[in-house]
């Protein structure tokens, strides 16, 4: 039982937020799907029988069903953006302080771009200046063949931004394997403090973290903290456009049926672009482009949150539209 309110939620309450209840999330928010041990597994209202993503999958279901216009979520590796992509809604991971290798940002899921801007206190500009837009279709953190409809959506979005007057260029993976290896170790180290029984995946991370020595710990923090500079050095662009998911949301139970190691790696294959923005501390936004099966991901490298939302508005069309089930 909690003994105090999280500072982020306390600020929301002080500003008049109404919190009707708590939604389902996986154990410690450590998976990109929402199948908590011993509890019901929320279904994806836009693709019944398939995962709504995670870790904020329960919140995404509430928003996608229209039960609430927005819901609190957190993002330590894509946990706002992945559920948004799975359920046809809008998810924004704000820029955050990555001090001491912190990957987590607090934010919201929302049904429309207008609602997302409102809850994130962003004023969407009527127009944005000409920007340099990098297009990344190469997976960053895993090798995977990306589904054709995901790639086609990014291609059409890039064309739309070019027609809107932006300079659009292809970019390549910005770094090698070391940053994600560091992220994996950071998750493992953060799991060491988990007491008692845990799910197979969390137990595996905890055991793995307990074997990481002090020298390696210092090295992974240094590597993690260098990601922002690596990204900015690699790409001379203002905004990054990429897919969010490599393939459609899989059936409920798909990941959990695997060994913990395969589970972790396959989740990474499914979402190979998300974690980079957690390590870099940069803002990123996911929304449905054209239809719920083609979510796209735009990240702010050298622009403000308002400008990022402005770019999204160019692609989103009517910012008050809501995907109907």
Question: Model-derived features: where do they sit?
Answer:
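Short low-complexity, flexible loop/linker segments enriched in glycine and/or proline
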Residues: 34-38, 85-88, 181-188, 257, ...
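Short amphipathic alpha-helices in soluble, non-transmembrane regions
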Residues: 311-315
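Hydrophobic/aromatic ligand-binding patch that stacks against planar heteroaromatic rings
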Residues: 11, 60-62, 160, 275-278
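Amidase signature
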Residues: 122-271, 279, 317-325
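Short glycine/serine-rich loop segments
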Residues: 5-6, 13-120, 283-295
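Residues within well-ordered alpha-helices
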Residues: 7-8, 32, 58, 157, ...
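Conserved small-residue hinge/capping positions at short loops/turns
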Residues: 1, 18-21, 25, 133, ...
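Short, well-ordered beta-strand elements
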Residues: 292-310
């Amino acid at each position: 039982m909690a003994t105090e309110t999280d500072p982020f939620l306390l600020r929301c309450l002080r500003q008049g937020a109404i919190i009707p209840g708590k939604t389902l999330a996986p154990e410690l928010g450590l998976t990109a799907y929402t199948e908590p041990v011993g509890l019901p597994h929320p279904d994806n209202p836009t693709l019944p029988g398939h995962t709504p993503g995670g870790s904020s999958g329960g919140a995404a279901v509430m928003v996608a069903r229209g039960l609430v216009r927005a819901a609190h979520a957190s993002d330590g590796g894509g946990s706002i953006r992945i559920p948004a992509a799975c359920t046809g809604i809008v998810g924004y991971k704000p820029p955050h302080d990555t001090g001491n290798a912190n990957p987590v940002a607090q934010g919201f899921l929302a049904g429309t771009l207008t609602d997302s801007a409102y809850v994130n206190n962003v004023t969407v500009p009527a127009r944005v200046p000409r920007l340099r837009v990098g297009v990344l279709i190469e997976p960053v953190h895993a090798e995977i063949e990306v589904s054709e409809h995901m790639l086609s959506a990014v291609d059409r979005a890039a064309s739309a931004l070019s027609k809107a007057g932006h300079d659009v260029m292809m970019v390549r993976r910005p770094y090698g394997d070391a940053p994600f290896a560091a992220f994996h170790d950071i998750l493992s180290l953060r799991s060491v403090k988990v007491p008692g029984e845990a799910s197979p995946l969390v137990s595996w991370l905890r055991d793995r973290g307990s074997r990481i020595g002090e020298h390696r710990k210092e090295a992974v923090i240094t590597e993690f903290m260098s990601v922002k500079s690596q990204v900015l050095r690699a790409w001379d662009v203002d905004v990054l456009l990429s897919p969010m998911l490599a393939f459609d949301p899989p059936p409920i139970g798909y990941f959990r049926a695997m060994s913990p190691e395969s589970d972790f790696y396959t989740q990474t294959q499914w979402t190979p672009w998300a974690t980079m923005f957690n390590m870099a501390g940069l803002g990123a936004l996911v929304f449905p482009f054209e239809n719920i099966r083609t979510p796209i991901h735009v990240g702010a490298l050298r622009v403000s949150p308002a400008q990022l939302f402005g770019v999204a508005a160019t692609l989103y069309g009517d910012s008050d539209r809501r995907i109907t089930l």
